[in-house]
Each structure stands twice: as C-alpha cells, then as structure tokens.
Amino acid sequence: PAVNQNSSIKDVIVEITQKRLGLTAVLDENDTLKGVITDGDLRRMLEKGNDILNTTAKDIMGIHPKTIEGDALAVDALDRMRKNNITQLIVTEDKHYAGVIHLHDLIREGII
C-alpha cells in the first residue's frame, strides 16, 4: 500500500482499507519513501479534530518509518519487528518503496 504525499485523507483511508494491512507508505513523485500512515495515525487525527477536507498525507504521516532493505534476510526482519514491537516493516530498495513485509508473511513462510 502506498499513496503520494499530497494525497487526500479520503485516498489514504481507501488505500489502507483496500490493502488491509493497517498502514500505507507515503511517497514523493519519485517513489522515494517519505513516511508512513497507520490506522492509529488516522484515529489520532480525528480525535484532534483536524480539518479532514484540507489535510493531506504529508500532514499526518510519521516521518521515521521502520524499514528494511529488500535484500535483507527474513530473520533480520523478524528481529527488527521484535525490537520495535511492531508487526510490519516497509521494504525499500535504495530508499525507494518496494513493499511491506508483515509478521504473518514470516509465519506463512515458516520463519517462525
């Protein structure tokens, strides 16, 4: 799941909902990773009463997403997830978005 940093909140919600991972990467025009938005970020935005119609992805994204390079070992992904108490990592290749790896992917592949 990925959206442009200038995407509307509606587009962010649709992307997160359709991809069913609870997050979306936020990219610039060159597909460079700029941040991440989780379903929790959306809930916090709503709690604050932000103007949804005039808010964009870059306004609410976390700017330090947890990432892993595409050529990393699965065991390294698992270790990073455990250390950060998270279930997903954004996969990058040379700072460009390549996808998301979820804990369930590691379970399905027999890593854990």
Language model segments and positions:
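Bateman (tandem CBS) regulatory domains
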Residues: 54-65
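The conserved cystathionine-beta-synthase
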Residues: 3-20, 27, 46, 67-87, ...
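Short beta-to-alpha loop/turn elements within the nucleotide-binding domains of ABC transporters
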Residues: 37, 55, 72, 101
